[in-house]
Amino acid sequence: MAKTSMKAREAKRAKLVAKFATKRTELKAIIVDMNASEEARWDAVLQLQQLPRDSSPSRQRNRCNITGRPHGFLRKFGLSRIKVREHAMKGEIPGLKKASW
């Protein structure tokens, strides 16, 4: 199991990403826009750098909803491979069954 502090840190990052999402997209649009003046684009770059580091979506890590495990994460279920297998064997995931060929 992941430490509670790691789970809390990821939750904090998710909040920051949601909070600054619109501002980040606006600034990135200005930076990419070739019709904008060089000064406006440069100001947008500087403003983007001033935003909190954890407000970037690439800083987030997918974690298992039950254990907080960062590796072996399956997006479809929101769980790690270990927990998916456990729940599948108990029949708790509808439509999922063990492969046999």
Swiss-Prot record:
Any GO CC annotation of this UniProt entry: cytoplasm
Stated family: Belongs to the universal ribosomal protein uS14 family.
UniProt GO MF annotations: rRNA binding; structural constituent of ribosome
Protein name: Small ribosomal subunit protein uS14
GO BP terms, alphabetized: translation
Coiled coil: none
Function: Binds 16S rRNA, required for the assembly of 30S particles and may also be responsible for determining the conformation of the 16S rRNA at the A site.
Keyword Ribosomal protein in record: yes
Keywords noted in UniProt: Ribonucleoprotein, Ribosomal protein, RNA-binding, rRNA-binding
UniProt keyword annotation of Protein biosynthesis present: no
Recorded superkingdom: Bacteria
Binding partners and assembly: Part of the 30S ribosomal subunit. Contacts proteins S3 and S10.
Membrane-traversing stretches: none
